[in-house]
Amino acid sequence: MAEACEPTRPSEDEDEEREPLLPRVAWAQPRRVAPGSAVRMQADEGADVLREPATDEPPAVSGEGSISASLSTELDRTRTTSSETNTFLEDPEFADIVLKAEQAIEIGVFPERISQGSSGSYFVKDSKRNIIGVFKPKSEEPYGQLNPKWTKYVHKVCCPCCFGRGCLLPNQGYLSEAGAYLVDVKLNLGIVPKTKVVWLVSETFNYSAIDRAKSRGKKYALEKVPKVGRKFHRIGLPPKVGSFQLFVKDYKEAEYWLRRFEAEPLPENIRKQFQSQFEKLVILDYIIRNTDRGNDNWLVKYDEMKYAKKIESEESNWIDNKQLLIKIAAIDNGLAFPFKHPDEWRAYPFHWAWLPQAKVPFSEETRNLILPYISDMNFVQDLCEDLYELFKTDKGFDRAAFENQMSVMRGQILNLTQALRDGKSPMQLAQMPCVIVECSKSGSQGRVVHLGSSFTQTVHCRKPFFSSW
């Protein structure tokens, strides 16, 4: 259905799907030499250029020098722009994983579409067909033009007044996924699997009929009329930008374990570990204002058989993450970072607020971990700047909309700070009035926020039609 709608697709999406393709084999060696952070990935034309060493030019195709006319015509035709290069200078381990995924695609081990969910997301595999990550292309997000699932299309046709989430920027889910991981790292929470922005191309992705026809036509021209085919800038399908999250093994949906824990209560030390992990999930969701956190999209890892003897015989130090016997993984963070609080049809509540764990006040350990960060305005400013560096890589980046997103996030941080100081519980935190903290710059016009900036606090009084509280 998405292919049929392609001719009327917005021009911005059309441009995005028609960028040059990555060199397929020869890029492997340069990547190992200079892998870098996805947050520092170079911006597209028209966006601010990120200041990153050794990434101002497209990477060399071979280890001996840059691309030249003497190289093969195949490399010339697949030469890429720097905006589509998967470089991760600060994380060689992640770079190797992405490289394995690309090499697997080269030999025909394609990403597999995930049947669950309302968007086009894919299990990415290595050459041994082991799942190593989850890729969510921007163009196949829930409200994207190339979403292969019918759920949102039916929603749009049958109930257009409620279609979409009016508080979220459209087609920014991949940045939200990467932004959630950034917040997780900054706060030292350790519950979001590593997630960064990458470019991938695969036949199993959902492309428009036009893109597939052009790809077939170019291949046919190259085969029948090589002189003409060699003039094409790219042979093959265009790469897609999206979020790449490392796959976590041996985890199950929280819904399964929550039911088990009701019937079979946890030992006290394990219960404390779970409570600590749960509080970190609450903090993450609240700061980024996750609008899609149900008990089916966060995971729990707990092998009671494996750890039974250890649980009974030891009083484990549950603060030490290395000895954690139960862990939480916060996945599906693509519907977060709203530019305003939900105030239209639905409230998008935090479903964890109704769990028994949400009635327990935040522990002293959690307060000691989080308060030093979020009560420091320098830390909050630094967090906003890091998110700015990430979000501005999108072609449709809008500075005013980003400032609104940060105003909501600062308001969430303000509420969280007060709740931790007052010893409130997660449920009480979720019931606090919504606040917006806007920044009005004075003097110099910097990137995001300055120490000399003044802030205006506003209570958001408008309630959605279907309110949860």
Curated annotation (Swiss-Prot):
Record has Acyltransferase as a keyword = no
Its main subcellular localisation, reduced to a broad class, is cytoplasm
Offer one example of a GO biological process linked to this entry.
phosphatidylinositol phosphate biosynthetic process
| Disulfide bonds listed in the record | none
Any idea where the PI3K/PI4K catalytic domain is? Answer: 108-439
- Modified positions (Phosphoserine) are S37
Q: Where is this region: Important for interaction with membranes?
A: 149-162, 252-260, 345-354
Q: Which domain of life is it from?
A: Eukaryota
Q: Which Pfam families match?
A: PI3_PI4_kinase
Q: Which reaction does it catalyse?
A: a 1,2-diacyl-sn-glycero-3-phospho-(1D-myo-inositol) + ATP = a 1,2-diacyl-sn-glycero-3-phospho-(1D-myo-inositol 4-phosphate) + ADP + H(+)
Catalytic loop, as annotated region: 289-297
Q: Name one GO cellular component term.
A: early endosome membrane
Annotated stretches, region: Activation loop: 330-350
Q: Where is this region: G-loop?
A: 114-120
Q: What is the enzyme's main class?
A: transferase
Q: Which Gene3D superfamilies match?
A: 1.10.1070.20
Q: Which InterPro entries match?
A: Lsb6/PI4K2 (IPR039756), PI3/4_kinase_cat_dom (IPR000403)
Q: Where is this region: Important for substrate binding?
A: 141-143
Record keywords:
ATP-binding, Cell membrane, Cytoplasm, Endoplasmic reticulum, Endosome, Golgi apparatus, Kinase, Lipid metabolism, Membrane, Nucleotide-binding, Phosphoprotein, Transferase
Protein role: Together with PI4K2A and the type III PI4Ks (PIK4CA and PIK4CB) it contributes to the overall PI4-kinase activity of the cell. This contribution may be especially significant in plasma membrane, endosomal and Golgi compartments. The phosphorylation of phosphatidylinositol (PI) to PI4P is the first committed step in the generation of phosphatidylinositol 4,5-bisphosphate (PIP2), a precursor of the second messenger inositol 1,4,5-trisphosphate (InsP3). Contributes to the production of InsP3 in stimulated cells and is likely to be involved in the regulation of vesicular trafficking.
Its family remark reads:
Belongs to the PI3/PI4-kinase family. Type II PI4K subfamily.
Which protein are we looking at? Phosphatidylinositol 4-kinase type 2-beta
Species name: Mus musculus
Starting at the broadest rank, the lineage of the source organism is: Eukaryota, Metazoa, Chordata, Craniata, Vertebrata
